[in-house]
Swiss-Prot record:
Enzyme class: hydrolase
The protein's assembly and partners: Monomer.
Catalyzed reactions: 5-methylsulfanyl-2,3-dioxopentyl phosphate + H2O = 1,2-dihydroxy-5-(methylsulfanyl)pent-1-en-3-one + phosphate
Protein name per UniProt: Enolase-phosphatase E1
GO biological process: L-methionine salvage from methylthioadenosine
Protein family (similarity comment): Belongs to the HAD-like hydrolase superfamily. MasA/MtnC family.
Gene Ontology MF term list: 2,3-diketo-5-methylthiopentyl-1-phosphate enolase activity; 2-hydroxy-3-keto-5-methylthiopentenyl-1-phosphate phosphatase activity; acireductone synthase activity; magnesium ion binding
Cofactor(s) essential for the protein: Mg(2+)
Pathway this chain belongs to: Amino-acid biosynthesis; L-methionine biosynthesis via salvage pathway; L-methionine from S-methyl-5-thio-alpha-D-ribose 1-phosphate: step 3/6; Amino-acid biosynthesis; L-methionine biosynthesis via salvage pathway; L-methionine from S-methyl-5-thio-alpha-D-ribose 1-phosphate: step 4/6
Keywords: Amino-acid biosynthesis, Hydrolase, Magnesium, Metal-binding, Methionine biosynthesis
Entry EC number(s): 3.1.3.77
Listed InterPro entries: Enolase-ppase_E1, HAD-like_sf, HAD-SF_hydro_IA, HAD_sf
Amino acid sequence: MGIRAIVVDTAGTTTDLNFIQDTLFPYSSKALADFLEENQTNVLVDNCISDVKDIALEPDASLERVVEILQQWIAEDRKATPLKTLQGLIWKQGYAQGEFKGHIYPDFIDSVKEIKAQNVRLYSFSSGSVDAQKLLFSHSDGGDLTEYFDGHFDTRTGNKLFKQAYLNIINTISLAPKQVLFISDVLEELKAAEQAGMRVMQMVRETTQRTGDYPQITNFKELSF
């Protein structure tokens, strides 16, 4: 059964992890307090603030306290949905103002056309919000790549470390599990996807990276169809 869809992880796979850690995270951390102060009456932002209070079990938390909680979550790289939603909104500002461009590895930029030419669908799955993924790929240093994607998935689909998230993706895209290839640098994610029946492949871009018994590539040009 041939591959009909590829699902890619972002950080460490399509995108340099350093861009996330050294550019995006610090930008959202620095802008967070002002952004919440200026946008707290926005329905989406207000809902995120409420969700933060719920998750932290602090229903009466002040806005200042919410900022403290979110800053701690950023430092911990916590995959909380309200944090990821707010980060996406803040990054949207940064992209629009030209503060940075999304880093995408050149080999992925070169490969997306070939993937589409082979009639293979392309999706991304990240702990970052769908909106943040769209921003990354639409404002990339290789131009707007969104036309090559058939969809994006985030924490609303499920935790990347658990099988159910990948079962949800399979159900959404309506393909047999073995028709879907998941590519990530993280062993635990590959294990979860494999448990869901997907084919998996580890992206190994760093020599210091933990590796397992999965098929490996060092860049997307090594993919064969």
